[in-house]
């Protein structure tokens, strides 16, 4: 009986360790794909040059077209403002007062975005 209990215990431990390892691998790989972001009030100068995702509302009267495909605007979380520079095609839902997530790097107090994601509420209807 002793040998049977020991074998069962070893089998349970191996199954538990295998499941824990599998879950760890899945969570590690998902970390890069989960879109989380920091509000402007949580950004500090220490994170210069690091790839970040920042999110907030586009401030009213802050959109400034520099060139045909280059734009600057300010996002806010009602605590702190952050200027964003972006070159590329704007998302269809981009407008003042709209929530956005910008992916890029902080440089000299300005955020240089390489990608913009427009957020929408649960009542989204595609533009017609």
Swiss-Prot record:
List the transmembrane segments: 9-29
Q: GO biological process: any one?
A: cytochrome complex assembly
Primary location class: membrane
- Which GO MF terms are attached to this record? heme binding; metal ion binding
Query: Which InterPro entries does the record associate with it?
Result: CcmE (IPR004329), CcmE-like_sf (IPR036127), NA-bd_OB-fold (IPR012340)
Location in or out of the cell: Cell inner membrane
UniProt-listed HAMAP family: CcmE
Cited NCBIfam families: PRK13254.1-1
Q: Which family does it belong to?
A: Belongs to the CcmE/CycJ family.
Q: Outline what the protein does.
A: Heme chaperone required for the biogenesis of c-type cytochromes. Transiently binds heme delivered by CcmC and transfers the heme to apo-cytochromes in a process facilitated by CcmF and CcmH.
Q: Spell out the protein name for this chain.
A: Cytochrome c-type biogenesis protein CcmE
């Amino acid at each position: 009986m002793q040998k049977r209990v020991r074998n069962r215990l070893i089998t349970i431990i191996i199954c538990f360790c295998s499941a824990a390892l599998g879950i760890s691998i899945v969570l590690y790989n998902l970390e890069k794909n989960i879109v989380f972001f920091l509000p402007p009030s949580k950004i500090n100068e220490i994170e210069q040059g690091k790839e970040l995702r920042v999110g907030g509302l586009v401030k009213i009267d802050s959109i400034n077209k520099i060139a045909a495909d280059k734009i600057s605007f300010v996002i806010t979380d009602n605590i702190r403002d952050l200027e964003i520079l972006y070159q590329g095609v704007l998302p269809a839902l981009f407008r003042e007062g709209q929530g956005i997530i910008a992916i890029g790097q902080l440089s000299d107090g300005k955020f240089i975005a390489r990608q913009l994601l427009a957020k929408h509420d649960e009542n989204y209807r595609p533009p017609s």
